[in-house]
Amino acid sequence: NLLRSISHDLRTPLTSISGNALILTEKNPLLTEEKRRELSAAIYEDANWLNHLVENLLSITRMENGQVNLRIQPELIQDIFDDVLAHLDHDAACHTIVANVADDLLMADMDAQLIEQVLVNLINNAIKYTPEHSRIELFAAPEGKFVRICVTDDGPGIPEESRDKLFDMFYTLGKTRSDGRRGLGLGLALCRSIVAAHGGVIDVQNVAPHGACFRFTLPRTEVTLYE
């Protein structure tokens, strides 16, 4: 199942990379500088997509095998949001992505690198299934002894029959992006594994009038202010 999925979903970007690279190496006088830039950008985007896929594959393998040692420490949610937004891919520029925190001093106990990977996966997922120039919002607020973090988009939402299976490994919605790429169904499964390792839960709900809200919890850090 894994090998079948990998061979199917790596073929499209690899074919695109090799085809575009071949065109660039040919000395075609009709190939304008603008077209060369477009082909170079396409190669970069395909390579970046492959890199994300391999990162998710390696990460979820380590999580499933218990090979990840969590480096838990208190982190400011605002700092985590800022870091994630600063390292988003080129595709993110076509969307309006905002981040809001209910309390500037809101903190949670986490492995920052892993939680940032969760947020990047959720944001990339929202980018994948929403039209260009749509809005994606990150929001965090205290909820008892936890912090609830939400990634909300204004796309088509999640079919009712898919919500319970969405975080299963290799499950996809069956939708293919306009560029022919289709995920392996690892990103959300990895998110669930990481959140569960932190003692939290993750789920998804549809929002009115349309869109989806992916929510997960982390243990809240108690902040004591001294006069």
Outline where the language-model segments fall:
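Short alpha-helical segment of the dimerization/phosphotransfer core of two-component systems
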Residues: 45-50
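Short helix-loop "hinge" at the ATP-lid/N-box region of the Bergerat-fold HATPase_c
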Residues: 126-127
